[in-house]
Swiss-Prot record:
Keywords: Cell inner membrane, Cell membrane, Ion channel, Ion transport, Membrane, Transmembrane, Transmembrane helix, Transport. It is found in: Cell inner membrane. The chain crosses the membrane at residues 21-41, 82-102. This is Large-conductance mechanosensitive channel. The keyword Nucleus does not apply.
Length: 140
């Protein structure tokens, strides 16, 4: 088998195609989460903490006196911990959403099959039926 045909067989396997689809959807989903955090959650957090903009939180490492992160990065090295806070919140939200999705998938996959209806008990043996008839006739 040639290398090209082996690669073709590998590339069209279900797992590889599923992985490719997952990566593409994951990239798009990451952008959704990034927008959720940047455009919805962080403004609310900023409002709660008095109008703070976490993206501009930094510590200058070169002694510069810039007022924004962009200016500080142009002037020298900075420790941009505000950006890190935003990325950490992105990660926590994304990890939680993925955890909930996997939890639901596992619940659906491991749903127990419905229990079969109980089978009717087998009819009693002929000698038991005969003995019951004799007993019933003696009671009368």
């Amino acid at each position: 088998m040639s290398v090209l045909s082996e690669f073709k067989a590998f590339a069209v396997k279900g797992n590889v195609v599923d992985l490719a689809v997952g990566v593409i959807i994951g990239g798009a989903f990451g952008k959704i989460v990034e927008s959720l955090v940047g455009d919805v959650i962080m403004p609310i957090v900023s409002k709660i903490f008095g109008g703070l903009d976490f993206s501009n939180y930094f510590i200058p490492l070169a002694g510069q006196t810039a007022t924004t992160l962009v200016e500080a990065k142009k002037a020298g090295a900075v420790l941009a911990y505000g950006s890190f806070i935003t990325v950490a919140i992105n990660f926590m939200i994304l990890a939680f959403i993925i955890f909930m999705m996997i939890k639901q998938i596992n619940r659906l996959q491991s749903a127990p099959a419905p229990a079969p209806a109980p089978a009717e008990p087998p009819p009693p043996a002929e000698d038991i039926v005969l003995l019951r008839e004799i007993r019933d006739s003696l009671k009368r």
